[in-house]
Structure formats: C-alpha cells, structure tokens
C-alpha cells in the first residue's frame, strides 16, 4: 500500500506548521497534494510553550491554545484548519527509512509515501543520560523536555512532590527555564553543570553572574564545574539522590535533564550532505538533492551576515523563518533570494527577559546597570571595529529593534571606551541614521527618548512581536 503527494513535510514541530501556513497562503498546492508526517499525535504546536506557560501551577497553557502559528500572532492551525485547507495530517506515524533517490518514505506500519518535493523538518531530539554512560536514567521521576509527552510527564512529576527537591542537570536554555518553572511550583532547585557559569555557549561570565544571583535570590542552588555520575534509588526504582563526580550526594525527589540536543538526521545520513551536525542546505534551504529541503533545527544553512559561514541554529525563530523560506523557494524559485537571516535568540524567566542578535565573537563591551532589581543591561561583541553581536536584558520594543539594527548593519565602532560609555544609546543613535554605516561620533549627545518602563518586558522576535506584544499577551 502507498500514497503519493506532491509536497511532503516530514516532522510535526514548529517548522511544519509555519511551512503549512506558507503553502496555504501562496496557494501552492491542490487539495490532497500536501501532507505532514509526524510521530506526535497532535497538529504542530509552539514548542516554547512547553518550558514556559505549560508548566505554570495555575492558568497553564494547554492545546489547542498554542498550536502554530500563534507564536507569531498569526492563525491558530488546529486539525480543523488543516482539513479545511486540504492538508493531510499523518499523525502518530514513524518513518523508518527514506530513499532520496526513489523519493519515498517507509513508515513503521509498512506504508510507502512518495513525494515530488520533501521538506525535512525532523528537528532534534534531547540527548539522554545513557549516551554519557549514566545507568538507571529510565527512572519514573527523571524528566526530559522536548515534546508534549515529556511536558505532561514533567507536570505530573512536579505535582507528585510539592515542596520537594529537584535537581536540574544542565545550565543551558532548558535547564534555566525549567529551574524557573520548578521554583514557581514551589519546588526547591539545585542546578548542576560542568561549565563555570550558566548559558556558557552565549553568556559572558558577567552576564551569567547577574542571572545566577537572581536565581539564587529565588532559592536556586548552583553546583558548577562537576557532573552527575550515578543515582541512588529506593525500592520502587525512583531516584532519591544524585551522586556527583566529586562524591557529593544531592537529595532528589525529581530530576530534570537538559544536556543538549542532537539534530535528527539519521534517515538521511549517507544520502545527503551533512555539516555542523545537521543537513547542509544552500540559501534556498535546498539540500544536495534537488527535490529535498531542510528547515529548522536539522538544517545547517549559510548566514550572509557571517560571510556565508554555515551554521545550524537551535531556536524557534530560525525554525519559523527557514520553513517559510523553503516554501517560497519551492513555489517561486526565480523570485526567492537566498535567505538573509539575522541569528536571534531570546528567553524569559521570572520577571526577566533578554534578546541576543548576531554572533558572540570578538571583544566584549558590557553596558548598563547590572545591579538594579528591574535591570536594563547588555553587551556588544566587536570584531575588526564592527558590531558582530548584541545582547540586551529588559529592553523595550524600540530598544530591541535598535540592537538588532546595529548588528545587521555591522555598525562601525571608532572608540571602544566611548562605546562602553554610551552603551545602549549607541545602538539607538545608529538606528536613527539614514546611512547604514555610521561610526560612533565621540562626545555626541543622546537624542533618543527612552520608552522602556520598569517591570516585565517580554522577549520578542523582530519579525513577530505579536508573540509577546499582541493584543492578548499569552503566558507562554
């Protein structure tokens, strides 16, 4: 048995939903010509909700409230929407082999699905402790967070140990956001990671110090520079303590693991070119095969801003944009230019929120107030007298736009000391100039009227401010 489609989207995450909406708006298919194949049993949804609003103790986000594409303040794509738009959802279905040459996919049920164009949106999977030689990591109170099933388990485990002790393994995105959620659920948290500070791939030590101090004020304990080696368990097999490399035992009613992800490339290894741990694509999101595209976490694509250097970006904003771009390239290849993406990352925890744009390479110039309870601080990364990256905590919409603009423009820096002195004003003034390449004018007086107010400023994508700034602010 088998079915044939013109367009197949393999994977049911964020990228799949945004690709589907782009197809529908461009009218690039007839009813029954487009399908999404997903191992999950629900239509594509906004994954950021899982580590934010989904974990709230009260008023938690639940489906259908966060199906794509509400993350961009756009349409809510429920199963009904896909049916009305002639898009077939093949849910709860695992593809076990892919034959790029024959343009076929074989499912676990034995069905063969053929395609003319394939968009690989398989995303990435969470790394598991057993991959690092840690046995016993299948205990019922050990949680990961990558999909809806993971989130449901995490919620249930949290409910089972009110006021208990949680050990969070990992100091990156998932570790930090889950730690905040655990605290909100009145669970005591200890974070363990091997690096010298949290968010080590992005944060400078100075930036990390602020967030670690803030978390500490909320009751979080940090254990840095060491790793988990084993567990102690009770007679039922539940973890009761975490044993570290230095021999320390940490009491644990639950464990949350966030030690990174790995792109889901397995079906296509040996068939498509790989780079940066993902599937290599060009500026049209096209792989080494002329009928196969890759988007989201699984895609390694050229960043124009970095002179065409290939990068694989693990963030929802990249998933949304690359998905839309691939559909445009499929339907209107002659009109679609190479993607020109500004790398963008954001997070929000407690009353804090930050955004980062560009590349964190070069000399770091910090600015702003790192001591205020309602902070507004940041950093520039400068290389060869040009702004290469920018970070801002607690900014307004206009201020986030300003730092993104100076990164995209690669604004010229004449004097590092003056850049540090002017701080955010440099970005604001540069953004107001007509010329794309203005230098830092020494002694220039700030002319910008500050719009930010104290309190919670939610993180937002420049392309999709509605995600946090829409008429009805969503709590995820």
Swiss-Prot record:
Binding site for NADP(+): 173-177, 201, 260, 314-315, 346
Entries under SUPFAM superfamilies matching the protein: FAD/NAD(P)-binding domain, FAD/NAD-linked reductases, dimerisation (C-terminal) domain
Enzyme Commission (EC) number: 1.6.5.4
Membrane topology (Peroxisomal): 25-447
UniProt cross-references to Pfam families, sorted A to Z: MDHAR3-like_C (PF21791), Pyr_redox_2 (PF07992)
Transmembrane residue ranges: 4-24, 448-468
Cytoplasmic compartment spans: 1-3, 469-476
Cofactors: FAD
Broad EC category: oxidoreductase
Binding site for FAD: 12-15, 40, 47, 52, 146-147, 297, 316, 346
Record field: catalytic activity: 2 monodehydro-L-ascorbate radical + NADH + H(+) = 2 L-ascorbate + NAD(+)
Binding site for NAD(+): 171-177, 195, 201, 260, 314-315, 346
Positions of L-ascorbate binding: 320, 348
Molecular function GO labels: monodehydroascorbate reductase (NADH) activity; oxidoreductase activity, acting on NAD(P)H
Keyword terms, alphabetized: FAD, Flavoprotein, Membrane, NAD, NADP, Oxidoreductase, Peroxisome, Redox-active center, Transmembrane, Transmembrane helix
Transferase as UniProt keyword: no
InterPro entries membership: FAD-oxidoreductase/Apoptosis (IPR050446), FAD/NAD-bd_sf (IPR036188), FAD/NAD-binding_dom (IPR023753), FAD/NAD-linked_Rdtase_dimer_sf (IPR016156), MDHAR3-like_C (IPR048618)
Topology in the lipid bilayer: Multi-pass membrane protein
Compartments where located: Peroxisome membrane
Function: Catalyzes the conversion of monodehydroascorbate to ascorbate, oxidizing NADH in the process. Ascorbate is a major antioxidant against reactive oxygen species (ROS) and nitric oxide (NO).
Family classification: Belongs to the FAD-dependent oxidoreductase family.
Name of the protein this chain belongs to: Monodehydroascorbate reductase 2, peroxisomal
GN (gene name): MDAR2
